[in-house]
Amino acid sequence: MVKVGVNGFGRIGRLVTRAAVLSGKVQVVAINDPFIDLNYMVYMFKYDSTHGHFKGTVKAENGKLVINGNAITIFQERDPSNIKWGDAGAEYVVESTGVFTTMEKAGAHLKGGAKRVIISAPSADAPMFVMGVNHEKYDKSLKIVSNASCTTNCLAPLAKVIHDNFGIVEGLMTTVHAITATQKTVDGPSGKLWRDGRGAAQNIIPASTGAAKAVGKVIPELNGKLTGMAFRVPTPNVSVVDLTCRLEKPAKYDDIKRVVKAAAEGPLKGILGYTEDQVVSCDFNGDSHSSTFDAGAGIALNDNFVKLVSWYDNEFGYSNRVVDLMVHMASKE
């Protein structure tokens, strides 16, 4: 079983740990977070406003975090190169601080004995992998990889199925996205774009996202053919992608539904879901798929121009893919 270290015990760090425990496919052996002490880790892991109580045991014992009887070594280092991952037995490190997202910065984990690093965010220079889309291109010479973003993980499987079957000439994506930790609870200063600093609970906030362009990195044939933007909305979790695209080969909407359903039940099972139910965002809270196609929500203007809708739990679905990517990487050792 893959032995994993988690750097940064925030939303993704905690949920990757939950996903790891639930899957039983990887074992978390170490966690580093300079801002959260051990007893606070117990509390934060046990109680979650979005995903509910952890259904298991969690306690602090002998200076370790013990989850379901598994003792996890705790570090509180600010500098990733000082974390002794090797001593704790961690071979793979999930870099989930959101801070060390380049090859150089994430590479600091290798100094402490980690063998591989998975960045749980898009990266400017690390190779990006999306499970079900381009994970087969991973080879073991790569020490540092990125699991891309939650939105890229939602869009890419859908775009792949559509492109493989009908060809995408060009497309625009909008993600209606739940609030995240980088936003402000009330109006405040924002580093980059002024409106990013407006109160998250009060506003629909247009925002940038590199998720659609990143699809071109994981599906090279779509490079330059997709771009997109986000609306941040006042919901705590679950987001939805709207992909509006021009098709090379004409297709009836029923044809599109058929191929997506076939992919969801076949090669992309567990990654891409399919539903014809009258669902809303809450119905996907805690859903482990990267993307669930909403057959009833999409529309076609004509046989070449369509709007496709797909839901995702931007926290938990993504965290499950981080685990899946590590399992896949380990299978190549």
Curated annotation (Swiss-Prot):
CDD domains given in the database record: GAPDH_I_C, GAPDH_I_N
Record's GO cellular component terms: cytoplasm; cytosol; GAIT complex; lipid droplet; microtubule cytoskeleton; nuclear membrane; nucleus; plasma membrane
Entry binding sites for D-glyceraldehyde 3-phosphate: 149-151, 180, 209-210, 232
Positions marked as site (Activates thiol group during catalysis): 177
Processing after translation: S-nitrosylation of Cys-150 leads to translocation to the nucleus.
One Pfam family linked to the record: Gp_dh_C
Residues that coordinate or bind NAD(+): 11-12, 33, 78, 120, 314
Subcellular location: Cytoplasm, Cytosol; Cytoplasm, Cytoskeleton; Nucleus
GO MF term set: aspartic-type endopeptidase inhibitor activity; disordered domain specific binding; glyceraldehyde-3-phosphate dehydrogenase (NAD+) (phosphorylating) activity; identical protein binding; microtubule binding; NAD binding; NADP binding; peptidyl-cysteine S-nitrosylase activity
Pathway the protein takes part in: Carbohydrate degradation; glycolysis; pyruvate from D-glyceraldehyde 3-phosphate: step 1/5
Entry annotated with the keyword Nucleus: yes
Signal sequence region: none
Keywords of the record: Apoptosis, Cytoplasm, Cytoskeleton, Glycolysis, NAD, Nucleus, Oxidoreductase, S-nitrosylation, Transferase
Positions of post-translational S-nitrosocysteine modification: 150
Biological-process GO terms, alphabetical: antimicrobial humoral immune response mediated by antimicrobial peptide; cellular response to type II interferon; defense response to fungus; glucose metabolic process; glycolytic process; killing by host of symbiont cells; microtubule cytoskeleton organization; negative regulation of translation
Catalyzed reactions per annotation: D-glyceraldehyde 3-phosphate + phosphate + NAD(+) = (2R)-3-phospho-glyceroyl phosphate + NADH + H(+); S-nitroso-L-cysteinyl-[GAPDH] + L-cysteinyl-[protein] = L-cysteinyl-[GAPDH] + S-nitroso-L-cysteinyl-[protein]
Active site annotation, chain numbering: 150 (nucleophile)
UniProt EC number: 1.2.1.12, 2.6.99.-
Source superkingdom: Eukaryota
Functional note: Has both glyceraldehyde-3-phosphate dehydrogenase and nitrosylase activities, thereby playing a role in glycolysis and nuclear functions, respectively. Glyceraldehyde-3-phosphate dehydrogenase is a key enzyme in glycolysis that catalyzes the first step of the pathway by converting D-glyceraldehyde 3-phosphate (G3P) into 3-phospho-D-glyceroyl phosphate. Participates in nuclear events including transcription, RNA transport, DNA replication and apoptosis.
PANTHER family: GLYCERALDEHYDE 3-PHOSPHATE DEHYDROGENASE, GLYCERALDEHYDE-3-PHOSPHATE DEHYDROGENASE
Family to which this protein belongs: Belongs to the glyceraldehyde-3-phosphate dehydrogenase family.
Complex and partners: Homotetramer.
Name of the protein: Glyceraldehyde-3-phosphate dehydrogenase
Organism of origin: Coturnix japonica
Organism phylogeny: Eukaryota, Metazoa, Chordata, Craniata, Vertebrata
Gene name of the encoded protein: GAPDH
